Amino acid sequence: MSIFLVTGTSTDVGKTVVTAALASVALQSGKSVAVLKPAQTGVDVDGAGDLAEIERLTGGGVTLVELARYPEPLAPDTAARRSGLPLLALDDVVRVARDLDTTHDLTLIEGAGGLLVRLGVDGFTARDLAAALAAPVVLVVASGLGTLNHTALTVEALGASGVECAGLVIGSWPQEPDLAERCNREDLVSVSGVPLLGLMPAGSGSESVQEFAQTAWGALGKSPLAI
């Protein structure tokens, strides 16, 4: 049984697609998988959130758990206060994650926004959650200009709390990368000190289940997380 937390250097870097890819690779390896989304924002009660996207891409077979949903597209802490809905408590998220871990080979926790976005009561963050669970973090990063600084800062913030960064995944790799992107692919490892686990091709989130399974395996099937 193992738990990994998936976070990003910012919002919209591909966390959901990478989480789905990790789940798909694990399913193809015969593992049981759970995905926990502590807080979903920017989606109405009846709307399709990130877990629906993961279900679509993996074709089912994954246990999906969402703990809180807030309608405005804001940090969960802010969205909860503005909506009047209850804030998440760190202890509750830890309990659910540990329960899932007892019944699944792999439990993935998808954060909201970046590492230090406030998620709930007392302003706890994804870093606090990873520390409480002793869960390694998979860091989803951008490919273009600015990513070296954002990545180095996030890895440094993890290290300051004693949280392991299992590796980096570029969440959207263009078909024709420019000079900065080609250089970043090499430099991300040297500036962060952690391995680059894989690159998800741009547009892979629009693929069919079968296509996505092949893409996910090609990108992450040989990473240490797939073993």
Curated annotation (Swiss-Prot):
Catalytic-site annotation from UniProt: 37
Recorded catalytic activity of this chain's protein: (7R,8S)-7,8-diammoniononanoate + CO2 + ATP = (4R,5S)-dethiobiotin + ADP + phosphate + 3 H(+)
Pathway: Cofactor biosynthesis; biotin biosynthesis; biotin from 7,8-diaminononanoate: step 1/2
One Gene Ontology molecular-function label: dethiobiotin synthase activity
S-S bridge residues: none
GO annotation, cellular component aspect: cytosol
Keyword Aminoacyl-tRNA synthetase: no
Cell compartment(s), UniProt: Cytoplasm
EC supergroup of this enzyme: ligase
Any Pfam family the entry gives: AAA_26
Co-factor(s): Mg(2+)
Keywords from the named record: ATP-binding, Biotin biosynthesis, Cytoplasm, Ligase, Magnesium, Metal-binding, Nucleotide-binding
Gene Ontology terms: biological process: biotin biosynthetic process
Chain positions recorded as ATP binding sites: 12-17, 50, 110-113, 171-172, 201-203
Gene3D superfamilies named in the record: P-loop containing nucleotide triphosphate hydrolases
Enzyme Commission code: 6.3.3.3
Record has Ion transport as a keyword: no
Binding locations of substrate: 41
Functional note: Catalyzes a mechanistically unusual reaction, the ATP-dependent insertion of CO2 between the N7 and N8 nitrogen atoms of 7,8-diaminopelargonic acid (DAPA, also called 7,8-diammoniononanoate) to form a ureido ring.
Binding partners and assembly: Homodimer.
Similarity remark: Belongs to the dethiobiotin synthetase family.
Entry protein name: ATP-dependent dethiobiotin synthetase BioD
Species whose genome carries this gene: Rhodococcus erythropolis (strain PR4 / NBRC 100887)
